UniProtKB/Swiss-Prot annotation:
Binding site for UDP-alpha-D-glucose: T274, Q337, W355, N356, S357, E360, D376, Q377
PANTHER family per UniProt: GLYCOSYLTRANSFERASE
Record key words, sorted: Transferase
EC identifiers of the protein: 2.4.1.-
Gene it is expressed from: UGT94-289-2
Protein name, UniProt field: Mogroside IIIx synthase
Length: 473
């Protein structure tokens, strides 16, 4: 396929190299490419591209409407190419990966010069990307893979340092609030670092910012973020990977057989993402919490890359697996989360509340037991409770996970009749925003509205203004 022929508009996408960023970008790319008026260049590291190749539908692979483009990061003895991803990356190497990504700006400029796309869609962690695009007269818009709640809460103190957040209906618990803000509401040093990164990326976006969210969840935050940025903020979510090919996910057969033997909505899926590795103490509290809950569970345990010695038995309390018996299935490394959440016997998701996992839980109508760990996750956990689709397992005054709270939260969500409201609200999310929602999303009308081959900042803003108007109709 010649991307430059006819009226095809070329878009280059540059996500951060974490799964929680790659997959929403890929879903956006797939949706746009199906319009047949767009050719997508999907730019990332070699190891990241290898990870997403199996998730490309055969129809897209055959017509080459999404073309994978390698971004070469500088390698070093501590950060060889196979570690150019956050998936399983040891936490002490994360700063080196961020620095290597920044150092790839020169190679990215060569890519832009060679491909000359009509538009760049970039991620929240690359303030240098729109600068490179601007130097080549290529308009760039930001796509945030997290929600408007966290973005607006983080940016508010910078714009209005002496006033409270105006639309808050939930308050961060003491442990998390102390991490990001001082007693008078000002940002801490950690909070300032996050705010500076976000502001640099969002304010340089051409007239519009895309967010992987939807109005029924975050209307007031989306509108307030638009005020803070003085830009249109367009929700294009929920963008969640939807597996639809039989045999696509290896290892699911044994998991499905196990799930098939359980009662409807009787099982929780436990996962803390691909980037966070709970400490020994945290693992024990979570394990004992699961044991005390007396609920069936599938738990995915992940270990950092290069850790070939850790075993499931070593990571868990002595005798835990024997005591759990048939209630438990523990999987090392990876499990097909979307397929498990879709199964009729799954009744809850015990999650770190990464935005992507949270969207998946909502998309498949599964209530969430939130156990946030860091970054945007405390904000997301608060939003889960505010939306009524889950509960947060409260930590103690020192910020430590409590087994009793984990067990209590699981029981509330899965068993207790008094929290049928949570289960009902989660099911409503599935009905409104399940697997068919994004095909109905107004983003799918991109091709009908986008008329200009090489848009300027102004035309990009006008186009997305139409998207917002259609969203509200």
């Amino acid at each position: 396929m010649d991307a430059q022929q006819g009226h095809t508009t070329t878009i280059l996408m540059l996500p951060w190299v974490g799964y929680g960023h790659l997959l929403p970008f890929l879903e956006l790319a797939k949706s746009l490419s199906r319009r047949k008026l767009f050719h997508i260049y999907f730019c990332s590291t070699s190891v990241s591209l290898d990870a997403i190749k199996p998730k490309l539908p055969p129809s897209i692979s055959s017509d080459d409407s999404i073309q994978l483009v390698e971004l070469r990061l500088p390698s070093s003895p501590e950060l060889p190419p196979h570690l150019h991803t956050t998936n399983g990356l040891p936490s002490h190497l994360m700063p080196a990966l961020h620095q290597a990504f920044v150092m790839a700006a020169q190679h990215f400029q060569v890519i832009l010069q060679t491909l000359a796309p009509h538009l760049l869609i970039y991620d929240i962690l690359q303030p240098w990307a729109p600068q490179v695009a601007s130097s080549l007269n290529i308009p760039a818009i930001n796509f945030s893979t997290t929600g408007a709640s966290m973005l607006s809460r983080t940016l508010h103190p910078t714009h209005y340092p002496s006033s409270k957040f105006p639309i808050s209906e939930f308050v961060l618990h003491n442990h998390w609030r102390a991490m990001y803000t001082t007693a008078d509401g000002a940002l801490t040093e950690e909070g300032h670092k996050i705010e500076e990164t976000l502001a640099n990326c969002l304010h340089t976006s051409c007239g519009v910012v895309l967010v992987n969210s939807f109005r029924e969840l975050e209307t007031k935050y989306i509108d307030y973020l638009s005020v803070l940025l003085n830009k249109k903020v367009v929700p294009v979510g929920p963008l969640v990977y939807e597996p639809n090919q039989e045999g696509e996910d290896e290892g699911y057969s044994s998991i499905k057989n196990w799930l098939d033997k359980k009662e409807p909505s009787s099982t929780v899926f436990v996962s803390f993402g691909t980037e966070y590795f709970p400490s020994k103490e945290e693992m024990e509290e979570i394990a004992y919490g699961l044991e005390l809950s007396e609920v069936n569970f599938i738990w995915v345990l992940r270990f950092p890359q290069g850790d070939s010695t850790s075993t499931i038995e070593d990571a868990l309390p002595k005798g835990f697996l024997e005591r759990a018996g048939e209630r438990a299935m523990v999987v090392k490394g990876w499990a097909p989360q979307a397929k498990i959440l879709k199964h009729w016997s799954t009744g809850g998701l015990v999650s770190h509340c990464g935005w992507n996992s949270m969207m998946e839980g909502m998309m498949f109508g599964v209530p969430i037991i939130a156990v946030p760990m860091h970054l945007d996750q405390p904000f997301n956990a608060g939003l889960v409770e505010e939306a009524g689709v889950g509960v947060e397992a409260k930590r103690d005054s020192d910020g430590k996970i409590q087994r009793e709270e984990v067990a209590k939260s699981i029981k509330e969500v899965v068993i207790e009749k008094t929290r049928e409201d949570v289960r009902k609200k989660a099911r409503e999310m599935d009905t409104k925003h399940g697997p068919t929602y994004f095909s109905r999303s107004k983003v799918s009308s991109f091709g009908r509205l986008y008329k200009i081959n090489r848009p300027t900042t102004l035309t990009v803003g006008r186009f997305w203004s139409k998207q917002i108007k259609m969203k509200r109709e």
